[in-house]
């Protein structure tokens, strides 16, 4: 009921603002920068979707309409700040370099940790399993994630849990996801390794259970780029070893004081594939990471053969994350960017004065 009430009030507020019947003091716009608007006295844009090494020109224009921009990783911040395009000076007709001028700050993502909650009727018959969590999409490099994993463990009694979907968690989506997975598996009819498809909505507690399951030994992710990499963060927070490329958003929480706390997969930066281009979001002339097949397989093998070492490193990372990326610290950092502490104290003092006058 509270959620419905809140959604109703948000919708009403948006309508009143666009009709110019309400002038809010501040707007926080959580969306892709294409949709940033100057609708209040102070406008803050908040976006997570920067997975390449260049943003679209429209993002620079829309970003400069904001008073502040918040992003979820240093990769996103650096990419946004370093992107330039050519624009025409309306007064002189001269071609000039155009870039973001708006201040941009990093506020890392976080989710509330829930206690483990078992997933009913989900039984693993293999004792050593890897986990991957992604959509079936070009950016996630899912086909190679699965194909190369099978080739590495084709004659081993090892499992891979594939938590995925194509677009949503409907029954039709399950059939489509299952068929796509079958197409990959048909190439390896004699494999001994096992693939488990996990589809549909899972609660936060069920995700925590996955990360802590005794039979799940590592999370793998060789996507081309991540704005932050929330599943990797959640898994690392629980002490699950991570296998990934050392590029894009996940490096913020997988590195500490120059040290890597994950199994590093080598990669090359190359132009994005044609099928991944999304005009105004993923630029055709931008690039992202392409994991090296041999390095990925070696990382899988090292984790399988030396799991105790991987677990020890993951345990150290868990401690670091609980100290430096805990929920309260990330929440405080986010609030500070919306309403700075000194301004909050000033508002509190004004409210206290008002209440004292009333009393």
Descriptions of predicted regions:
Residues 2-80:
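Extended catalytic core of nucleotide-activated donor transferases of GT-like folds
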Residues 68-116, 266:
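Donor nucleotide-sugar binding/catalytic pocket of nucleotide-sugar-dependent glycosyltransferases
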Residues 241-244, 260-264:
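Short hydrophobic beta-strand element within catalytic cores of glycosyltransferases
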Residues 166, 268-359:
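C-terminal amphipathic helix plus adjacent low-complexity
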Residues 215-217, 239:
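A short alpha->beta transition loop at the rim of the catalytic pocket in nucleotide-sugar-dependent
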Residues 224:
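Aromatic "clamp/platform" in nucleotide-sugar-dependent glycosyltransferases that forms part
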Residues 171-210, 217-218:
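Nucleotide-activated donor-binding/catalytic signature segment of Leloir-type glycosyltransferases, i.e.
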Residues 122-140, 146-150, 160-162:
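Conserved donor-binding/catalytic core segment of Leloir-type glycosyltransferases
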